[in-house]
Amino acid sequence: LDACSRRKHVKSAQYDHFAGIARQEREHDAERLFRAMAHAERLQEYNCANAIVRLGGRYAPPEHVTVFRGTTDDNLRRSIDFARRPPEGLHADDIERALQSGNRYAARVLIWARSGDMRHLALMETCRRRLAANGPADARNEIAGRRANNGTAGVPANGTARASGRGTAEGSENSRPDATADNAPKGYLVCPTCGNIYPAGCSDSYCPCCLTDGRRFVAFEE
C-alpha cells in the first residue's frame, strides 16, 4: 500500500505538470485528460494512505518529485510506456497476497488503483492517436483560419443572408481554440470515491467499481 501511494503521488504531480504543458500548446483534450488523471491519482493515493493508517501504519508522501519536460505528444508517449511496464517484484502479486491474507479491504483499494492504471492507459492511447491524426494545434488553427477566410471570400456586400450566415458559421466552428473538439470528448468525469474515470457522455449511472452515484462524479470539461 505504501509503494502504491507513493507511485500515485508521483504520477499526480507529473500529470498536473503535463496538463500545464498541454494548455500552453492548446492541446485542450490532452489538458483535460491529464487534469482528470491527476485528480484520480490523488484520490487513489488518499485511499491507499487511509488504508495504511486504518491498518495501523503511517504514510509519508515523497518530499521531492522529478517532473519530465517535453511536448504533449512526448509526455503522452512517456506515460503510456510507463503504464505498459508490468509490475515488478512484490508489486506483481500485491493484490493476490492481500486476498490470501484475508485483507479484502487492502485488496479492494489496490484493485481500484490497478484498474485505474489500465483505464488511464487506454484513454492516453486514444488521446495520442487523436493528436497524431489532427496534427499540432498551431497547424490546425492555421488551417481553420484559412477555411474561415475562404468561407467569407467572394461574398458580395449584398449577398443573401443564407450564404453569408453559412460562411460565418463554418468559420467560427473550425477556428475554435480547441480544434480537436470535433472528435474528442467534451471532457472527463472522475468518481470521487475510487478514482474511476470516464469520457464525458459515456459514464455509468453508478460507478461499477464502488457503486458511487454518477451524479457525484467530478467533471473536467471545457
Identify the meaning behind each predicted range.
Residues L1-E222:
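Non-heme di-metal
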